[in-house]
């Protein structure tokens, strides 16, 4: 069963799920949410029903990955693209699997033409994100291997889920986050006091 939970932003994306169900009749596709966002209750139900959380995101909008943290807090192993903030959350081989991807538009030595157009105000944010997404290639064989690994090994699935839940408690629990903010404020205040009023 493929359970999708979230917000389908347009009819094209909604149609892709219809096409998926048509092309793979042996696959049961269930969606929570849709053209309107899933409710908090629906999200909790989806996490409770899931065995694995998969987010093969391919765009710049996934800079942190709150949904990944929610899945880890729910004790689910995570399969996510090795992209932006996801790689800071998922420990490859320990709390889940990171699927390699490449940004075909990115160059090492200078900003891409697309990034330059955005910086100059010639492209808006939505267009830039959309066009960048077209240039990101996900390793589909690695995604398939990660899914098969977790589906064929309930023990590994459980161990990764447990490790993810522990990681959340250690690094991302509200008590930890508040303590880190307090420490940052103390450091910033010390810098301000050292340099005097501006």
Give the location of each predicted region:
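Acidic, amphipathic alpha-helical patches
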Residues: 17, 40-44, 86, 143
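Short acidic alpha-helix that forms the nucleotide-activated donor recognition element
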Residues: 38-50, 73, 91, 109
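Acidic donor-binding loop of glycosyltransferase active sites
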Residues: 45-62, 76
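Conserved acidic donor-binding loop of glycosyltransferase catalytic domains
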Residues: 56, 81-82, 99-100, 105-107
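Short hydrophobic beta-strand element within catalytic cores of glycosyltransferases
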Residues: 77-80, 90, 97-98
């Amino acid at each position: 069963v493929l359970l999708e939970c979230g917000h389908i932003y347009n009819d094209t994306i909604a149609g892709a799920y219809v096409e998926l169900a048509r092309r793979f009749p042996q696959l049961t596709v269930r969606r929570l949410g849709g053209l309107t966002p899933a409710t908090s209750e629906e999200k909790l139900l989806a996490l409770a029903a899931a065995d694995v959380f998969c987010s093969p995101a391919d765009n710049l909008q996934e800079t942190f990955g709150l949904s990944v943290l929610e899945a880890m807090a729910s004790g689910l192993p995570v399969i996510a693209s090795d992209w932006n903030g996801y790689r800071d959350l998922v420990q490859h081989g320990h709390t889940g699997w990171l699927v390699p991807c490449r940004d075909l538009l990115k160059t090492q030595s200078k900003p891409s033409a697309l990034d330059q157009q955005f910086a100059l105000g010639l492209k808006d944010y939505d267009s830039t994100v959309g066009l960048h997404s077209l240039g990101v290639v996900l390793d589909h064989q690695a995604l398939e291997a990660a899914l098969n690994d977790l589906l064929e090994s309930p023990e590994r699935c459980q161990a990764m889920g447990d490790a993810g839940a522990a990681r959340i408690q250690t690094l991302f629990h509200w008590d930890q986050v508040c303590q880190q903010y307090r420490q940052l404020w103390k450091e910033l205040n010390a810098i301000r006091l050292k340099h005097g009023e501006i």
